[in-house]
Regions:
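N-terminal first-folded block
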Residues: 1-21, 25
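Short, charge-patterned binding micro-sites
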Residues: 26-48
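C-terminal structural segments of small proteins and small subunits
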Residues: 45-84
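Solvent-exposed, flexible loop/coil residues
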Residues: 5-8, 30-33, 73-75, 80-83
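Homeobox/homeodomain signature
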Residues: 14-19, 30, 59-61
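A generic structural signal for short beta-strands and their flanking turns/coil linkers
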Residues: 20-22, 36-40, 70-72
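Short amphipathic alpha-helical surface micro-motifs
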Residues: 21-26, 55-59
Length: 84
Protein backbone atom coordinates (compact mmCIF):
# COMPACT_ATOMS: atom_id res chain seq x y z
CA UNK A 1 0.00 0.00 0.00
CA UNK A 2 1.62 3.24 -1.13
CA UNK A 3 -1.14 5.82 -1.41
CA UNK A 4 -4.18 7.16 0.40
CA UNK A 5 -6.33 5.56 -2.29
CA UNK A 6 -4.84 2.13 -1.52
CA UNK A 7 -5.22 2.70 2.20
CA UNK A 8 -8.85 3.74 1.88
CA UNK A 9 -9.58 0.59 -0.15
CA UNK A 10 -8.06 -1.59 2.59
CA UNK A 11 -9.81 0.29 5.42
CA UNK A 12 -13.14 0.09 3.60
CA UNK A 13 -12.66 -3.67 3.23
CA UNK A 14 -11.83 -4.04 6.93
CA UNK A 15 -14.87 -2.01 8.00
CA UNK A 16 -17.16 -4.11 5.79
CA UNK A 17 -15.65 -7.47 6.81
CA UNK A 18 -15.72 -6.77 10.55
CA UNK A 19 -19.19 -5.22 10.33
CA UNK A 20 -20.53 -8.34 8.60
CA UNK A 21 -18.82 -10.80 10.95
CA UNK A 22 -19.47 -9.14 14.32
CA UNK A 23 -22.27 -7.08 15.91
CA UNK A 24 -20.08 -4.00 16.51
CA UNK A 25 -19.83 -0.43 15.36
CA UNK A 26 -16.52 0.27 13.62
CA UNK A 27 -15.02 3.40 12.03
CA UNK A 28 -11.69 4.96 11.15
CA UNK A 29 -11.17 7.55 13.90
CA UNK A 30 -7.65 8.94 13.33
CA UNK A 31 -4.82 9.21 10.81
CA UNK A 32 -7.21 9.67 7.87
CA UNK A 33 -4.60 11.69 5.96
CA UNK A 34 -1.69 9.26 6.43
CA UNK A 35 -1.39 6.39 3.96
CA UNK A 36 0.90 4.45 6.33
CA UNK A 37 -1.45 4.16 9.31
CA UNK A 38 -5.09 3.89 10.37
CA UNK A 39 -6.72 3.99 13.77
CA UNK A 40 -10.03 2.18 14.11
CA UNK A 41 -12.62 2.68 16.82
CA UNK A 42 -14.81 -0.29 17.66
CA UNK A 43 -17.86 -0.16 19.93
CA UNK A 44 -19.96 -2.96 21.40
CA UNK A 45 -22.86 -2.86 23.84
CA UNK A 46 -24.02 -5.71 26.05
CA UNK A 47 -25.52 -6.38 29.46
CA UNK A 48 -22.65 -8.83 30.01
CA UNK A 49 -19.06 -7.55 30.33
CA UNK A 50 -17.84 -11.06 29.48
CA UNK A 51 -19.74 -11.00 26.20
CA UNK A 52 -18.16 -7.68 25.21
CA UNK A 53 -14.73 -9.02 26.13
CA UNK A 54 -15.19 -12.15 23.99
CA UNK A 55 -16.54 -10.07 21.12
CA UNK A 56 -13.62 -7.61 21.16
CA UNK A 57 -11.13 -10.49 21.37
CA UNK A 58 -12.76 -12.10 18.32
CA UNK A 59 -12.57 -8.82 16.37
CA UNK A 60 -8.92 -8.36 17.37
CA UNK A 61 -8.16 -11.93 16.30
CA UNK A 62 -9.80 -11.36 12.90
CA UNK A 63 -7.80 -8.16 12.38
CA UNK A 64 -4.57 -9.90 13.40
CA UNK A 65 -5.17 -12.68 10.83
CA UNK A 66 -5.37 -10.25 7.91
CA UNK A 67 -2.42 -10.36 5.52
CA UNK A 68 -2.94 -6.81 4.20
CA UNK A 69 -2.39 -5.01 7.52
CA UNK A 70 -0.17 -5.12 10.60
CA UNK A 71 -1.91 -4.72 13.95
CA UNK A 72 0.39 -2.50 16.02
CA UNK A 73 -1.62 -2.46 19.23
CA UNK A 74 -4.96 -2.33 20.94
CA UNK A 75 -6.43 -0.24 23.72
CA UNK A 76 -9.71 -1.21 25.33
CA UNK A 77 -11.93 1.00 27.48
CA UNK A 78 -15.13 -0.05 29.20
CA UNK A 79 -18.05 2.05 30.35
CA UNK A 80 -20.53 0.60 32.80
CA UNK A 81 -24.06 1.85 33.25
CA UNK A 82 -24.72 3.50 36.58
CA UNK A 83 -27.06 1.63 38.90
CA UNK A 84 -30.43 3.28 39.21
Amino acid sequence: MHSLKDKRRVVKSILADIGRAHPVGIAEVDHQDLWQRATLGIAAVSASPGHVDRLLRAVTSDLDKRKDVELLGTTWSYLEAADR
